[in-house]
Amino acid sequence: CLVGSEMCIRDRCYVSWTNDRTKQVILDNIHRSPLYAGMIEGVGPRYCPSIEDKIMRFSEKPRHQLFIEPCGAETEEMYLQGMSSSLPEEVQIAFYRTIKGLEHVEIMRNAYAIEYDCCDPLQLNATLEFRDYPGLYGAGQFNGSSGYEEAAAQGFVAGANAALKVLNRDPLILDRAGSYIGTLIDDLITKGVTDPYRMMTSRSEYRLVLRQDNADERLTPIGRKLGLIDDRRWAKFEKKQAQKEAEMKRAEKTVFSPTDALNEVLVSCETSPVTTGVRLSELLRRPQVTYADLTPIDIER
């Protein structure tokens, strides 16, 4: 955990697959799907198509995977990830019950399809404010994106900037090099969309440095400036950064002799032994060697 205490709350998720019977039920009723009856004409999300879309577009596939996920810690409801559908209720219950593990399933809330309009995100500034309508901010599907995290990220940026504008403070603008939120917004406002936009690591040219293990280093100072990081958390962050900087300096200065003990550790890590002195920092650059691996020989740690 980066700045808080560890959380070990876990629950089981399950995997299952559709089969030939599932496919047949859907094909027999495909004419009842608004997606294929001409009632919905918009371009759907590319990365989470409905089950009938999967069956029709990938007819050569013998089965499709789905995830069965608990909706919460205090409910027996399960969410079927990968099984969205626009088919009628009786068809849904019929094809769900063809799937292994769901033979006796009951539906709490049916799957459904929606079609909605969105604005052209090219009209937006980096603050998510409309250029032609000062004071109006957009976020989420309204901006042409798809997904919960994408909507939440934009909602945060739009809301923060609306508040900052009222307070007459500098806006919050996240760039591509510092966050995936910055990449998401930059793509929307400079490239526009032809189908619902989903954020993926492959969209960022900085993905090697936009990692979860340095998220606090990249974003905590911004949060502090906004007033979202209290003194206790900021002190903890500064302490961690100071320790990290000191350890990196020590790694550059610490030199190990080519002893048998060192080479035994290196060989056990399946990397080549050394014949001359070597810096700790150089050993840590080897992909096979972790910081913990060198504990037995790094007596100054």
Q: Which residues fall in each region the model found?
A:
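C-terminal catalytic lobe of FAD-dependent flavoproteins
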Residues: 30, 34-42, 48-93, 97-98, ...
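Extended, charge-enriched "interface" segments that sit outside catalytic cores
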Residues: 203, 220-225, 229-301
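A glycine-rich dinucleotide-binding beta-alpha-beta segment and adjacent secondary-structure elements
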Residues: 67, 79-145, 173-186
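Internal hydrophobic alpha-helix adjacent to the cofactor/substrate pocket in enzyme cavities
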Residues: 151-174
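Mobile "lid/hinge" segments at catalytic clefts and subdomain interfaces of large enzymes
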Residues: 185, 193, 197-225, 230-234
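A glycine-rich phosphate-binding loop feature that marks nucleotide/adenosyl-phosphate handling sites
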Residues: 42-49, 110-119, 172-188, 202-204, ...
